[in-house]
């Protein structure tokens, strides 16, 4: 009896199990870096640590020709488009590159590009979206982006910003569309596997598959498509709102620059953020009373829901943004 194709629940359980172990590896590597180099270096290099963790996980499993922990958990194996052979080393290498490395590279290029295009070209200050010193203009990618966007006109910057936004949001929507399509047809769960033609076969035979599960997944796929349409509309609306708010902010900042030099000197003496060790911008207070940059503390709380100084636990929604605070 020929091996049967893996069912959608098996593929999803394998992916969820892999995500669980990848998350544990990322957390352990990030914790080691934080303990050895401190919070500042952890914030600066956390994306690279996550990339190395993912490459290590898939390099020791997929690239080496073994099952991942998730695939072993549900007893499924990868096969090439012929459905009779294990994928070649080259095909597995392309799979790991598309699944783990390419998203990092796109984020590394598109995010600094959007931040530099959103920044005021007439101002010497770095963009507000940066989080840490390595992201505030010190990285090679940011310097390259800044050098090539410095000569653009305002109209060209707006057009390029729209293109970068459409590309980044379009990739996210494509991923959601692909998952919804999987719920309906149940073949490729990850976009990288579709591009490489890698599918799954069962290693062991199971009792007859419940047809109600198939129907439920198809219904979930339809709901996911409707949710995708709604989220695309909300993202476009939010982008237009941000564009309008950015214009108002630039007008307000242009008026504020006309104030006297005394106030300029007072602003320049703002205290430092203890996370990035730079002038504190958009001050935000934790429930325990410590102050940080809004960008720094929100990035910190995305992985550690505690104060970086006193280690008091608190949920991220308890952060207090201080308006007009000096």
Swiss-Prot record:
<keyword id="KW-1133">Transmembrane helix</keyword>
<feature type="binding site">
    <location>
        <position position="307"/>
    </location>
    <ligand>
        <name>Zn(2+) 2</name>
    </ligand>
</feature>
<dbReference type="Pfam" id="PF04757">
    <property type="entry name" value="Pex2_Pex12"/>
</dbReference>
<feature type="binding site">
    <location>
        <position position="296"/>
    </location>
    <ligand>
        <name>Zn(2+) 1</name>
    </ligand>
</feature>
<dbReference type="Pfam" id="PF13639">
    <property type="entry name" value="zf-RING_2"/>
</dbReference>
<dbReference type="InterPro" id="IPR025654">
    <property type="entry name" value="PEX2/10"/>
</dbReference>
<dbReference type="GO" id="GO:0016740">
    <property type="term" value="F:transferase activity"/>
</dbReference>
<protein>
    <recommendedName>
        <fullName>Peroxisome biogenesis factor 10</fullName>
        <ecNumber>2.3.2.27</ecNumber>
    </recommendedName>
</protein>
<dbReference type="GO" id="GO:0008270">
    <property type="term" value="F:zinc ion binding"/>
</dbReference>
<feature type="topological domain" description="Cytoplasmic">
    <location>
        <begin position="237"/>
        <end position="326"/>
    </location>
</feature>
<keyword id="KW-0862">Zinc</keyword>
<feature type="binding site">
    <location>
        <position position="293"/>
    </location>
    <ligand>
        <name>Zn(2+) 1</name>
    </ligand>
</feature>
<keyword id="KW-0833">Ubl conjugation pathway</keyword>
<feature type="binding site">
    <location>
        <position position="310"/>
    </location>
    <ligand>
        <name>Zn(2+) 2</name>
    </ligand>
</feature>
<feature type="topological domain" description="Peroxisomal matrix">
    <location>
        <begin position="1"/>
        <end position="7"/>
    </location>
</feature>
<dbReference type="InterPro" id="IPR013083">
    <property type="entry name" value="Znf_RING/FYVE/PHD"/>
</dbReference>
<feature type="transmembrane region" description="Helical; Name=TM5">
    <location>
        <begin position="217"/>
        <end position="236"/>
    </location>
</feature>
<keyword id="KW-0962">Peroxisome biogenesis</keyword>
<feature type="topological domain" description="Cytoplasmic">
    <location>
        <position position="38"/>
    </location>
</feature>
<keyword id="KW-0808">Transferase</keyword>
<dbReference type="InterPro" id="IPR006845">
    <property type="entry name" value="Pex_N"/>
</dbReference>
<comment type="function">
    <text>E3 ubiquitin-protein ligase component of a retrotranslocation channel required for peroxisome organization by mediating export of the PEX5 receptor from peroxisomes to the cytosol, thereby promoting PEX5 recycling. The retrotranslocation channel is composed of PEX2, PEX10 and PEX12; each subunit contributing transmembrane segments that coassemble into an open channel that specifically allows the passage of PEX5 through the peroxisomal membrane. PEX10 also regulates PEX5 recycling by acting as a E3 ubiquitin-protein ligase.</text>
</comment>
<keyword id="KW-0812">Transmembrane</keyword>
<feature type="binding site">
    <location>
        <position position="273"/>
    </location>
    <ligand>
        <name>Zn(2+) 1</name>
    </ligand>
</feature>
<feature type="zinc finger region" description="RING-type">
    <location>
        <begin position="273"/>
        <end position="311"/>
    </location>
</feature>
<feature type="topological domain" description="Cytoplasmic">
    <location>
        <begin position="123"/>
        <end position="147"/>
    </location>
</feature>
<comment type="similarity">
    <text>Belongs to the pex2/pex10/pex12 family.</text>
</comment>
<dbReference type="GO" id="GO:0005778">
    <property type="term" value="C:peroxisomal membrane"/>
</dbReference>
<feature type="transmembrane region" description="Helical; Name=TM2">
    <location>
        <begin position="39"/>
        <end position="60"/>
    </location>
</feature>
<feature type="binding site">
    <location>
        <position position="276"/>
    </location>
    <ligand>
        <name>Zn(2+) 1</name>
    </ligand>
</feature>
<dbReference type="GO" id="GO:0016558">
    <property type="term" value="P:protein import into peroxisome matrix"/>
</dbReference>
<comment type="subunit">
    <text>Component of the PEX2-PEX10-PEX12 retrotranslocation channel, composed of PEX2, PEX10 and PEX12. Interacts with PEX19.</text>
</comment>
<keyword id="KW-0653">Protein transport</keyword>
<keyword id="KW-0576">Peroxisome</keyword>
<feature type="binding site">
    <location>
        <position position="288"/>
    </location>
    <ligand>
        <name>Zn(2+) 2</name>
    </ligand>
</feature>
<dbReference type="GO" id="GO:0016567">
    <property type="term" value="P:protein ubiquitination"/>
</dbReference>
<keyword id="KW-0472">Membrane</keyword>
<dbReference type="InterPro" id="IPR001841">
    <property type="entry name" value="Znf_RING"/>
</dbReference>
<feature type="transmembrane region" description="Helical; Name=TM4">
    <location>
        <begin position="148"/>
        <end position="185"/>
    </location>
</feature>
<feature type="transmembrane region" description="Helical; Name=TM3">
    <location>
        <begin position="90"/>
        <end position="122"/>
    </location>
</feature>
<dbReference type="GO" id="GO:0007031">
    <property type="term" value="P:peroxisome organization"/>
</dbReference>
<feature type="topological domain" description="Peroxisomal matrix">
    <location>
        <begin position="186"/>
        <end position="216"/>
    </location>
</feature>
């Amino acid at each position: 009896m020929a091996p049967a194709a893996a069912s959608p629940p098996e593929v999803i359980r394998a992916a969820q199990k892999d995500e669980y172990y990848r998350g544990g590896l990322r957390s352990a590597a990030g914790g080691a870096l934080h303990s050895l180099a401190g919070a500042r270096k952890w914030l600066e290099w956390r994306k690279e640590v996550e990339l190395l963790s993912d490459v290590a996980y898939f390099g020791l499993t997929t690239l080496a020709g073994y099952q991942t922990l998730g695939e072993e958990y549900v007893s499924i194996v990868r096969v090439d488009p012929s459905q009779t052979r294990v994928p070649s080393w080259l095909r597995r290498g392309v799979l790991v590159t598309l699944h783990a490395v390419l998203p990092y590279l796109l984020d590394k290029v598109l995010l600094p590009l959007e931040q530099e295009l959103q920044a005021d070209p007439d101002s010497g200050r770095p963009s507000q979206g940066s989080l840490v010193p390595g992201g505030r203009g010190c990285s090679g990618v940011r310097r390259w982006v800044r050098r090539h966007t410095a000569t653009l006109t305002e109209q060209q910057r707006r057009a390029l910003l729209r293109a970068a936004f459409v590309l980044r949001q379009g990739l996210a929507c494509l991923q959601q569309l692909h998952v919804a399509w999987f719920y309906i047809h149940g073949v490729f769960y990850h976009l990288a596997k579709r591009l490489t033609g890698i599918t799954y076969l069962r290693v062991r035979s199971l009792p007859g598959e419940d047809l109600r599960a198939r129907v439920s997944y198809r219904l979930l796929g339809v709901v996911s498509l409707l949710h995708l349409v709604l989220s695309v509309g909300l993202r476009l609306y939010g982008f237009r709102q941000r564009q309008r708010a950015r214009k108002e902010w630039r007008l307000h900042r242009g008026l504020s620059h006309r104030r006297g030099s005394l106030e300029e000197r007072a602003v320049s003496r703002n205290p430092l953020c203890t996370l990035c060790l730079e002038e504190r911008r958009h001050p935000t207070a934790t429930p325990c009373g410590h102050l940080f940059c809004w960008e720094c503390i929100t990035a910190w709380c995305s992985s550690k829901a505690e104060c970086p100084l006193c280690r008091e636990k608190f949920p991220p929604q308890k952060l207090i943004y201080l308006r007009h605070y000096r």
